[in-house]
Amino acid sequence: MSRKARDPIVLPQGVEVSLQNNEIVVKGPKGSLTQTLAPEVVVEIKDKEVFVSPAPNVVDRPSRVQGLFWALISNMVQGVSAGFEKRLEMIGVGFRAAVQGSVLDLSIGVSHPTKIPIPADIQVTVEKNTLISVKGINKQLVGEFAANIRAKRRPEPYKGKGIRYENEYVRRKAGKAAKTGKK
């Protein structure tokens, strides 16, 4: 049994959870999310608390799936109540970003502007041309979109130029030593 899944998920004010067929639906002030449940878990809703337990007939892999669905439901509850945000910073001469409609336009030191379509459930804002904020209620979509932006120009280890998460540590390497000595 998963250690985290032993504890119930406490629902904050304004968040409702319901079971429909084989799906769990979480509704809150920021929107609603749906997740299909695996047959290895049983979800019970009692008094503003959600309990995730293994199905009685499953012996194969109950604790892993139980912990997974506990985390998924917990993230859904947090997403519809508070939301998620990932912040990225661009470091480099001439690096800048802009949002044009539903497209994120990046100038990242290549010969052409890089355009990334923004998914419908994600809000992207650009501050000071080099700070990108990705917000949404689905933790997986927010993280995946932020990772796709970062993958366009990862921070390089010599000068640190590139796109990185805010407060991300980039391990630096020493460059080539200057040649000194005999001719």
UniProtKB/Swiss-Prot annotation:
- Could you tell me which PROSITE patterns the record lists for this protein? RIBOSOMAL_L6_1
* Listed InterPro entries: Ribosomal_uL6-like (IPR000702), Ribosomal_uL6-like_a/b-dom_sf (IPR036789), Ribosomal_uL6_a/b-dom (IPR020040), Ribosomal_uL6_bac-type (IPR019906), Ribosomal_uL6_CS (IPR002358)
Task: Name the source's superkingdom.
Answer: Bacteria
What GO CC annotations are associated with the protein?
cytosolic large ribosomal subunit
HAMAP family for the chain: Ribosomal_uL6_B (MF_01365_B)
How does it associate, per the subunit comment? Part of the 50S ribosomal subunit.
- Protein family per UniProt: Belongs to the universal ribosomal protein uL6 family.
What is the protein name stated in its UniProt record? Large ribosomal subunit protein uL6
Query: What species does this protein belong to?
Result: Chlamydia felis (strain Fe/C-56) (Chlamydophila felis)
Which gene is transcribed and translated to give this protein?
rplF
